[in-house]
C-alpha cells in the first residue's frame, strides 16, 4: 500500500516538473518573486515568535507588505499568462502598470500605518 502511494507521488511530482518546464521564463521570474515575498513574511513571523513583537505595528506592516505584494504578483502572473483566456485582450504593459500602481497604493497605506 505504501509503495504504490510513493510511486503515485513520484509520478505526480515528475508530471508537475515536466509541465512547469514548459512555463515561459517571464512567469518563472514572477513565481520566484512570489516565493521570495512569502519567505520574507515567514522569516518575519519566525523572528517575531523568537524575539517578540514590541513594535507590533511595524511587524504587522512588514507581514502585510510581503503578503500583499505576493498577492499582487499572483494577479500580475494571471494577467500576463498567455494561456489564461480571461485576460487575453489585456496587454502585458497594462498589467504591469496596474501592478506598479497597486503596489504604490499598498505601500502608501503601509507607510501610513507605520505612523
From Swiss-Prot:
Q: Which InterPro entries match?
A: DAD/Ost2
A GO cellular component entry from the record: oligosaccharyltransferase complex
Q: Any one Gene Ontology biological process term?
A: protein N-linked glycosylation
Chain ranges passing through the membrane: 32-52, 56-76, 95-115
| Residues in coiled coil | none
Instruction: Check the record and name the Pfam families matching this protein.
Output: DAD (PF02109)
Task: Please verify whether the record's keywords include Transmembrane.
Answer: yes
* Pathway in which this enzyme or protein is active: Protein modification; protein glycosylation
Q: Which residues lie on this side of the membrane: Lumenal?
A: 53-55
Q: Which residues lie on this side of the membrane: Cytoplasmic?
A: 1-31, 77-94
Q: Which UniProt keywords apply?
A: Apoptosis, Endoplasmic reticulum, Membrane, Transmembrane, Transmembrane helix
Has the keyword Transferase been applied to this entry? Answer: no
Membrane topology qualifier: Multi-pass membrane protein
Compartments annotated for it: namely: Endoplasmic reticulum membrane
Give the domain of life: Eukaryota
Q: Give the primary localization class.
A: endoplasmic reticulum
For this chain, the family text in UniProt reads: Belongs to the DAD/OST2 family.
Q: What does this protein do?
A: Subunit of the oligosaccharyl transferase (OST) complex that catalyzes the initial transfer of a defined glycan (Glc(3)Man(9)GlcNAc(2) in eukaryotes) from the lipid carrier dolichol-pyrophosphate to an asparagine residue within an Asn-X-Ser/Thr consensus motif in nascent polypeptide chains, the first step in protein N-glycosylation. N-glycosylation occurs cotranslationally and the complex associates with the Sec61 complex at the channel-forming translocon complex that mediates protein translocation across the endoplasmic reticulum (ER). All subunits are required for a maximal enzyme activity.
Q: How does it assemble?
A: Component of the oligosaccharyltransferase (OST) complex.
Protein name, UniProt field: Dolichyl-diphosphooligosaccharide--protein glycosyltransferase subunit DAD1
Source organism of the structure? Picea mariana (Black spruce)
Amino acid at each position: 500500500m505504501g509503495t504504490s502511494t510513493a510511486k503515485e507521488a513520484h509520478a505526480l511530482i515528475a508530471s508537475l516538473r515536466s509541465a512547469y518546464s514548459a512555463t515561459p521564463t517571464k512567469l518563472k521570474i514572477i513565481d520566484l518573486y512570489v516565493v521570495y515575498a512569502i519567505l520574507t513574511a515567514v522569516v518575519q513571523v519566525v523572528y517575531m515568535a523568537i524575539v517578540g513583537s514590541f513594535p507590533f505595528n511595524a511587524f504587522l506592516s512588514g507581514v502585510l507588505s510581503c503578503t500583499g505584494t505576493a498577492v499582487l504578483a499572483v494577479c500580475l502572473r494571471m494577467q500576463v499568462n498567455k494561456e489564461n483566456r480571461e485576460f487575453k485582450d489585456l496587454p502585458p504593459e497594462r498589467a504591469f502598470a496596474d501592478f506598479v500602481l497597486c503596489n504604490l497604493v499598498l505601500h502608501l497605506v503601509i507607510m501610513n500605518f507605520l505612523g
